[in-house]
């Protein structure tokens, strides 16, 4: 069973329907025990880092996800789900940084509105951008059959930091991770 994690925000039904459409046994859940014992986890996007972090801490979901990942449960993070893999995030965090899962080092922060030359960019970043694979990304199952330079759709104002887990990047004001991978079971 694939657990689509409900943290009281997110595009839950569309993710559940998509997984079911391709033959997955997907179920939306907020239950830490179901999360801990699921065959695979999906943490969907939409919402603010601070709200998601607070809800996931209060409900025990953070610890359940960490426990599942520690035993090797496959994980897919989408948008905010990618950011939550990091140590923390500043989105709507009135008192600095809210904690993330801490699987990857670094803090998700607001995307700069200007590049290094002072050129202005619209934030949020909404639209199609090409991605560039890191050298070893060609072996990632996340990009099986997808050529380097392919276009993906983005809608966001916050970005994950570059890290050893970065397997693809794109550029909008700055170059940032479009995808990350930890080992052979954690993808976003």
Model-identified regions with their sequence ranges:
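N-terminal beta1-alpha1 ligand-phosphate binding loop
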Residues: 2-24
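Short glycine-/small-residue-rich Rossmann-like dinucleotide-binding loops
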Residues: 9, 45-48
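Short gly/ser/thr-rich secondary-structure transition/capping motifs
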Residues: 21-28, 56-59, 130-137, 169-171
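Structural signature of beta-strand start/N-cap positions in the alpha/beta core
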Residues: 25, 40, 74-76, 151
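Short acidic low-complexity segments
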Residues: 26-37
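Amide-donor transfer/coupling interface in amidating biosynthetic enzymes
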Residues: 70, 106-188
């Amino acid at each position: 069973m694939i657990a689509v994690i409900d943290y009281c925000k997110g595009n839950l039904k569309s993710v559940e329907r998509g997984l079911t459409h391709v033959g997955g046994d997907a179920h939306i859940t907020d239950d830490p025990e179901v999360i801990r014992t699921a065959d695979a986890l999906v943490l969907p996007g939409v919402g603010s880092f601070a709200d998601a972090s607070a809800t996931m801490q209060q409900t025990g979901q953070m610890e359940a996800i960490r426990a599942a990942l520690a035993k090797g449960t496959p994980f897919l993070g989408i948008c905010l789900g990618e950011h939550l893999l990091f140590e923390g995030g500043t989105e709507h965090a009135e008192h600095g940084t809210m904690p993330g899962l801490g699987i990857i080092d670094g803090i998700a922060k607001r995307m700069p509105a200007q590049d290094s030359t002072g050129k202005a960019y619209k934030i949020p970043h909404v639209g199609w951008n090409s991605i560039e694979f890191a050298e070893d990304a060609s072996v990632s199952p996340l990009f099986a059959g997808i050529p380097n330079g392919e276009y993906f759709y983005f809608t966001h104002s916050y970005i994950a930091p570059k890290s050893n887990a970065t397997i693809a990047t794109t550029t909008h004001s700055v170059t940032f991770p479009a995808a990350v991978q930890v080992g052979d079971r954690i993808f976003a």
